[in-house]
C-alpha cells in the first residue's frame, strides 16, 4: 500500500506542478528542483525578487489546495504503519 500511495502522490504532484501557470511553474522549478536562489532566478528571468517570491507563494498555495486530499491519505497511512 505504501509504494502505491507514494507513486500516486508523486504522479499527482508532478501533474499539479505541470498545471501551474507557466511563469509560476518556471520559477517554482528553478527554486525547488534546481536549488537556485531567488536572486539568481530574478536575474535569469529578468524579473524582480518580489515577483519571484510572489510566484513561489502562489505555486505553494495552488499545490497545497490541489494536494489537500492526499494529505488525509498520508495521515491515515502513517497511522496504519505504526
Q: Whereabouts are the PLM-identified features?
A:
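Acidic, proline/glycine-rich intrinsically disordered inter-domain spacer in sigma factors
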Residues: 1-15
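Short amphipathic alpha-helical boundary/capping segments
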Residues: 11-21, 62-65
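Helix-turn-helix DNA-binding module
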Residues: 18, 22, 26, 34-51
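Glycine/proline-rich, flexible active-site/cofactor-binding loop segments
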Residues: 26-28, 47, 69-73
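DNA-recognition helix of helix-turn-helix
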Residues: 44-68
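C-terminal edge and immediately downstream basic/flexible tail or linker adjoining helix-turn-helix-like DNA-binding
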Residues: 60-82
Amino acid at each position: 500500500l505504501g509504494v502505491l500511495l507514494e507513486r500516486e502522490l508523486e504522479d499527482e504532484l508532478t501533474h499539479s506542478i505541470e498545471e501551474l501557470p507557466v511563469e509560476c511553474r518556471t520559477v517554482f522549478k528553478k527554486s525547488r528542483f534546481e536549488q537556485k536562489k531567488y536572486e539568481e532566478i530574478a536575474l535569469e528571468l529578468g524579473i524582480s525578487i518580489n515577483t519571484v517570491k510572489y510566484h513561489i507563494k502562489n505555486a505553494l498555495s495552488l499545490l497545497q489546495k490541489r494536494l489537500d486530499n492526499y494529505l488525509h491519505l498520508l495521515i491515515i497511512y502513517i497511522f496504519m504503519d505504526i
